[in-house]
């Protein structure tokens, strides 16, 4: 009887250890890839192709939790502009276990060689509207806005994600339609040829948009790798509004296809 009881206790102990071990593994938080954009049409294709488990809503912003191309993902549309983009990615990084961030969407073209529907993969980002406005005009100031120091004017994308995005874009669009370079961020929709030339000469920019640098700053603060990919819907000139209306959805889908190509490559 004593031997049977001893064996029973040992079996129970082994089962307890096994169950605890399994529970511990199950409780490990899932690592997600964060995908963020500014507008609905920039994530429509991704949501159509994704398997969404559930949707969390924080401060009226929806976070779609699920999988895409075999990868666990969180997809969100932050809204337009630097403030909304910073808020959206901050919430994402605080609420979920995010391993890396991909910002996808459309932009205005700045470089002469980059045409509508071409893709720009950001090597770095800069806030072109950060500076001092005096009687002498606007003077751009380098540095990290809000901190009073000057660690550098540009925010560098993660080199591994940058290369992954570039390779994916080349596969989707062809090498002649893909560029790597600086993306300039500001809280304006640029439709002015003269200002486009300034962005090119002052920052060596290839594209301009309204969110990327804000996402970059937050990701750097959280030590989270990130990349920004932008399809050109217009040339940020006097015809920008018309071009955006004609090509915005197609450009947005191009960026989404590149994101999916990246996710597939991550699983190889």
Across the structure, where does each feature detected by a protein language model lie?
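Secretory targeting signatures
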Residues: 1-25
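Short amphipathic alpha-helical "recognition" segments used for binding
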Residues: 7-8, 22, 46, 213-215
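Glycine-rich phosphate- or other oxyanion-binding loops that anchor nucleotides, phosphorylated ligands
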Residues: 29-33, 57-268
């Amino acid at each position: 009887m004593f031997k049977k009881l001893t064996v029973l206790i040992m079996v129970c102990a082994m089962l307890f250890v096994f169950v605890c071990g399994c529970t511990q593994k199950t409780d490990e938080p899932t690592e997600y890839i964060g995908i963020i954009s500014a507008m609905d049409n920039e994530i429509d294709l991704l949501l159509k192709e994704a398997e969404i488990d559930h949707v969390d809503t924080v401060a009226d912003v929806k976070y779609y939790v699920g999988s895409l191309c075999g990868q666990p993902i969180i997809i969100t549309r932050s809204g337009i502009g630097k403030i909304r983009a910073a808020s959206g990615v901050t919430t994402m990084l605080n609420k979920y276990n995010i391993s890396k961030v991909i910002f996808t969407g459309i932009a205005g073209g700045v470089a002469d060689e980059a045409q509508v529907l071409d893709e720009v993969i950001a090597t770095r980002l800069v806030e072109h509207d950060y500076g001092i406005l005096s009687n002498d005009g606007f003077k751009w100031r380098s540095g990290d806005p809000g901190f009073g120091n000057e660690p550098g004017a540009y925010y560098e994308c993660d080199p591994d994600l940058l290369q992954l995005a570039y390779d994916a874009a080349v596969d989707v669009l062809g090498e002649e339609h893909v560029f790597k370079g600086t993306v300039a961020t500001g809280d304006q929709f640029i439709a002015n040829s003269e200002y486009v030339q300034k962005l090119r000469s002052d920052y060596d920019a290839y594209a301009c948009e309204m969110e990327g640098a804000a996402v970059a700053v937050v990701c750097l603060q959280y030590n989270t790798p990130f990349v920004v990919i932008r399809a050109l819907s217009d040339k940020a000139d006097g015809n920008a509004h018309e071009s955006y209306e004609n090509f915005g959805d197609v450009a947005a889908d191009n960026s989404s296809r590149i994101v999916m190509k990246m996710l597939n490559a991550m699983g190889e």
